[in-house]
Regions:
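Short beta-alpha connecting loops at secondary-structure transitions
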Residues: 4-6, 88, 118, 143-146
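A generic structural signal for short coil/turn motifs at secondary-structure boundaries
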Residues: 9-12, 43-44, 66, 88-89, ...
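Structural core segment of the AMP-binding/adenylate-forming
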Residues: 1-55, 165-166, 171
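Conserved small/polar residues in nucleotide/adenosyl-binding loops
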Residues: 80, 172-174
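Conserved AMP-binding/adenylation subdomain of ANL enzymes
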Residues: 98-116, 126-169
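Residue(s) in the substrate-gating loop at a strand-loop-helix junction
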Residues: 122
């Protein structure tokens, strides 16, 4: 499991590590937790299970060979919102999903080398996975990422980010 000590949302700290600790009481399958220092708040670190990201990375080589994957290997599972029924885990595989988001991101946005792209969505949604993370990375797109809500601390936040980072391509899904 990879998490952070916390994250900022609307001026408050979301206790991500504490949430992970609580969820791990429900499973026996997670062996290690890697924690990124983001908010610098005090968190419980379980010896032998929890490791600071920064301490792990400083010991690693700058070189990392990519892992060879089969086309139908699992890429990720994303759960539906559960607004109409119990949330369902949707399995996304390597080749089909990556081909789809690479193609749609390229075709819809017609990204050029000098473009600055921003998708204002939540990474917890399929839109965020697809058009904040995978599509832009696969297309080598210069992207803006931000932490928090697009309307906090006020309704000008979204447009101030567009202006500050000179965004000229965007997908706003809020």
């Amino acid at each position: 499991m990879i998490t952070a000590d916390g994250a900022w949302r609307r001026g408050e700290i979301v206790p991500l590590k504490e949430n992970v600790d609580n969820s791990l009481e429900l499973t026996e399958f997670i062996e290690s937790v890697v924690v990124v220092k983001r908010t610098e708040q005090e968190v419980n670190m379980q010896e032998g299970r929890d490791y600071w990201y920064e301490e792990i990375v400083e010991k690693q080589s700058a070189e990392c060979e990519p892992e060879v994957m089969n086309a139908e290997d699992l890429l990720y599972i994303l759960y539906t919102s559960g607004t109409t029924a119990k949330p369902k885990g949707i399995v996304h595989t390597q080749a089909g999903y990556l081909t789809g988001v690479t193609t749609t991101h390229s075709a819809v946005f017609d990204v050029k080398d000098d473009d600055i792209y921003w998708c204002a969505a939540d990474c917890g949604w399929v839109t965020g996975h697809s058009y904040i993370v995978y599509g832009p990375l696969a297309n080598k797109t210069t992207s803006v990422m931000y932490e928090g809500a697009p309307n906090a601390p006020d309704e000008k936040r979204l447009w101030s980010l567009v202006e500050k980072y000179k965004v000229n391509l965007s997908l706003i899904h809020i």
